[in-house]
Swiss-Prot record:
GO terms for biological process: DNA recombination; DNA repair. GO terms for molecular function: crossover junction DNA endonuclease activity; magnesium ion binding. The keyword Metal-binding applies. Belongs to the RusA family. It comes from Enterobacteria phage HK97 (Bacteriophage HK97). This is Crossover junction endodeoxyribonuclease rusA. Binds 1 Mg(2+) ion per subunit. It comes from the Viruses. Endonuclease that resolves Holliday junction intermediates. Promotes DNA repair. Exhibits sequence and structure-selective cleavage of four-way DNA junctions, where it introduces symmetrical nicks in two strands of the same polarity. It catalyses: Endonucleolytic cleavage at a junction such as a reciprocal single-stranded crossover between two homologous DNA duplexes (Holliday junction). Mg(2+) binds at D70, D72, D91. Signal peptide: none annotated.
Amino acid sequence: MNEYQFVLPYPPSLNTYWRRRGSQYYISDKGQKYRKDVQQIIRQLKLDIFTKSRLRIKVIADVPDSRRRDLDNILKGLLDSLIHAGFAEDDEQFDDIRVIRGVKVPGGRLGIKITELESV
């Protein structure tokens, strides 16, 4: 079982990550920037491994301010960005997902720990 730990920037809210035009959804400029930032970090860490394994992810969400937040709203943008960056093939691979509220940190950040549950 391989384990990977790294830190990512705090994602834009779900409402600002996705946009809608008519009946079509697309990723906003903020969402595109976040995806590129995550891709750059994943490549720098040489984690663009396209794993096929089943995965467990633990996220420590250090929030950027004192506003009330639904922690589950960070998951879609985060997982989408990890897949786009080449860490795994599909967000369907995540069998165990935990999000824990951390402390307030200016700008926010996500502490990520991903464990491969089985090799394929």
